[in-house]
Amino acid sequence: MTRDIHDHRILILDFGSQYTQLIARRIREIGVYCELWAWDVDEADIREFAPKGIILSGGPESVAEEGSPRAPEYVFNAGVPVFGICYGMQTMAHQLGGSVQCSLEREFGYAQIELVEQSPLFKAIEDAVSESGAPLLDVWMSHGDKVEMIPEGFHTVAKTSYCPYAAMADEERQFYGVQFHPEVTHTRQGQRMLEHFVSDICGCEKQWTPAKIIDDAIERIREQVGSDKVILGLSGGVDSSVTAMLLHRAIGEQLTCVFVDNGLLRLNEAEQVMEMFGDHYGLNILPIRAEDRFLDALAGENDPEKKRKIIGNTFIEIFDEEAGKLTEVDWLAQGTIYPDVIESAGSKTGKAHVIKSHHNVGGLPEDMKLGLVEPLRELFKDEVRKIGLELGLPYNMLYRHPFPGPGLGVRVLGEIKKEYCDLLRRADAIFIEELHNADWYNKVSQAFAVFLPVRSVGVMGDQRKYDWVIAIRAVETIDFMTARWAHLPYELLEKVSNRIINEVNGISRVTYDISGKPPATIEWE
């Protein structure tokens, strides 16, 4: 068995599919480390990474169009197994001498493929059997183009009535391609296919487990910081909380957690954080009341991106100041996680478009005086939660709904004022309380209130009022890349609305956001 949990690893090249991060998460769930890189990576980087296997993701473009993305030629000469998914299969076929054609018919949604030849990728898996005795698999298709001719050395593994090459393989070189998406749950046996590729074909050992990740992180932290002191911004969110517990276990009293009450937190959150981490877990916490400083810095600013940058920069300024007051503090710890790194890095070709800057990555000033410690930067959110459970953090804290790094700064639309934050805090708390009371909190993936900077006429008793509007939002999602608005019961929505309007003086109207993602994002800013 290998000692380094990163030794056996898979490289995923991203061609732009909305499911690419899902591939990486599925590989990690198997117990194998993987990284996700842009498709236009240099050969030297692949050689240095030395993967046991390479996966080519799906993507929105057409292989038949000039200038569409291609895998580096080295991928097919690296001497390791290669697995092409959807667009990845098409570019593999094209680059190795086959042909891909645009089709007038497209195949989206559920499909049933028939296995026509055996392959290690599909070993001992089937969902049904055809009348002729052939294994059948239920899969999820999402493609327009299709392979018209497979390259020399390949054979057909599976087909559909529409797609003659639903799966292909060159067993000698260990090259595999599927036209469907094994990473999505709609492909019922997809996880087993990925496990066959990673474990059986690539020969990867399952070293990537919560206990081993913790041991590895502790060793790396100790190696990085030595006897130096570390300062961490503790918000009480999942990422910063798990970071705090990891650091506390690794370096103990060398860690000082700075808890900044920026005026953008949820109701009673400051008291809850201090009680849990200070009183219960015994961490060294330095509380800083900085509401006025943040609100002054944000005064007059309406642009969401600029608000995020201001909040991030103000945090760093405070950390710099507090570190200067402490002796020999050289390191700033952050709860940056892997999706932050992926989405902020983009593609080296410059084709990636920043939808929203990430609080942990995009807000760092160039002249920051402290070194960075980011023990979670290799982990997806679901992995962070599992690590937290292993470290002893409570389930209800780790699995509560996501809260953005900038806090209410991106849930108060437009300019941020203390009055708006106070109203929003109370409205949001009522919404969350009623979701718990109605046993709906754990049925939705995320729920929150948004302050709208518009006034609306209302009537309270015989009094006319002209007050602010609150929007409430609840969504259902598996991966947060797509989301459906939650169909909450009318009675629950009515109760939430009545409570907010009656109990939060200054609110005259409550609306329910019924936008999906896409086209809307989950957060309003």
Swiss-Prot record:
The active site is at C86 (nucleophile), H181, E183. PROSITE patterns: GATASE_TYPE_1 (PS51273), GMPS_ATP_PPASE (PS51553). Keywords: ATP-binding, Glutamine amidotransferase, GMP biosynthesis, Ligase, Nucleotide-binding, Purine biosynthesis. InterPro entries: Class_I_gatase-like (IPR029062), GATASE (IPR017926), GMP_synth_C (IPR001674), GMP_synth_GATase (IPR004739), GMP_synthase (IPR022955), GMPS_ATP_PPase_dom (IPR025777), NAD/GMP_synthase (IPR022310), Rossmann-like_a/b/a_fold (IPR014729). One of its GO terms (cellular component) is cytosol. Transmembrane segments: none annotated. SUPFAM superfamilies: Adenine nucleotide alpha hydrolases-like, Class I glutamine amidotransferase-like, GMP synthetase C-terminal dimerisation domain. ATP binds at S235, G236, G237, V238, D239, S240, S241. Pathway: Purine metabolism; GMP biosynthesis; GMP from XMP (L-Gln route): step 1/1. GO terms for molecular function: ATP binding; GMP synthase activity. It catalyses: XMP + L-glutamine + ATP + H2O = GMP + L-glutamate + AMP + diphosphate + 2 H(+). Homodimer. This is GMP synthase [glutamine-hydrolyzing]. It comes from Idiomarina loihiensis (strain ATCC BAA-735 / DSM 15497 / L2-TR). The lineage of its organism: Bacteria, Pseudomonadati, Pseudomonadota, Gammaproteobacteria, Alteromonadales. The gene is guaA.
